[in-house]
Amino acid sequence: MNYNKLIDHTLLKQDAMPEQIVKLCDEAKQFDFMSVCVNPGYVPLAAECLKGSDVKVCTVIGFPLGMNLTKTKVEEAVLAVKEGAQEVDMVINFGMLKAGHDDYVREEIYEIKQAVGRNIILKVIIETCLLNNDEIVRACLAAKAAGADFVKTSTGFSTGGATVEAVRLMRETVGPEMGVKASGGVRSHEDLLAMVEAGANRIGTSSGAKII
């Protein structure tokens, strides 16, 4: 398996500087990673750095809390795509999910997917460390019903990251036809292999150059 193509090479720290984004892109090209994942403000820079390469530009929407208005998330996603993003990782409204408003969560994901279009990969961050197993299942089913391309474990900015148990449950819930991205705390080749074994087919990590 080409593990390089599983990796979203990630830098989402709030103090990330332009030269660090350039380095991120250079490493992604060197190792032929699937994408770089950067905050929306750095999408134009990443798109310019990666022009002519196979590495995609990924960004985050409603990040990291997910508590924005749906229309704000939609506008943010559309603008990011206009600026060069090819993949969008959105954060759901966890409070609405926990309150049992699965229809709200599903509709929000659907609106963003419709807005960015079928050619843009949409990943749905469900922040598994904040959810029990029932909530993980419900979040995954909402994302699948809304037409998302992936479900993703974590923002990397909450109380925990990806776990083998959560990834396995997510894969069991969405089946083989939908992607599962493990993100948060994947820092070694052994971590990567464990997540892939559990069912992940995309890995979000800031340590891509070290773990391959």
Report residues per predicted region.
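Alpha/beta enzyme core
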Residues: 1-31, 41-63, 67-180, 188-210
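Calponin-homology-like cytoskeleton-binding modules
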Residues: 38
